[in-house]
C-alpha cells in the first residue's frame, strides 16, 4: 500500500464546495484517508534559482494524503472529490515515494 498526495485546484480556496460535501467524501475514504490536509490561502510563491515569483496561473488550493494499492485506485478515489462539481475544479494525484 502506497501513499498518494492529492493537490486540489479550484478558482479559489473558497470555491471548493461546502464542509458537508467534504466531510461525506472524507468519511467514504475511511481508513484510506491518512491526512485530510488543509486548504491554502489564495496565492503562493514559486522559488526559483533566480528569485521568487507569485503563483498566479491556477494556484493549488489545498491538499490531502491517502493510502491506496495503486495509482489507479488513488485516481479512482479522487473522482469522488467535491471539486468534481466545481467549474475548473481538479485533483492532481501524486505518489509519495518512500525514503
What do the PLM-derived regions correspond to, one by one?
Residues 1-99:
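Conserved, structured core segments of small domains
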Amino acid at each position: 500500500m502506497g501513499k498518494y498526495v492529492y493537490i486540489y485546484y479550484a478558482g479559489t480556496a473558497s470555491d471548493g464546495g461546502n464542509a458537508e460535501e467534504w466531510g461525506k467524501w472524507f468519511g467514504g475514504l475511511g481508513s484510506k484517508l491518512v491526512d485530510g490536509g488543509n486548504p491554502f490561502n489564495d496565492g503562493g510563491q514559486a522559488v526559483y534559482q533566480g528569485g521568487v515569483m507569485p503563483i498566479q496561473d491556477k494556484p493549488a488550493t489545498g491538499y490531502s494524503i491517502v493510502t491506496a494499492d495503486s495509482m489507479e485506485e488513488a485516481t479512482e478515489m479522487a473522482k469522488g472529490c467535491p471539486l468534481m462539481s466545481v467549474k475548473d475544479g481538479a485533483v492532481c494525484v501524486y505518489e509519495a515515494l518512500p525514503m
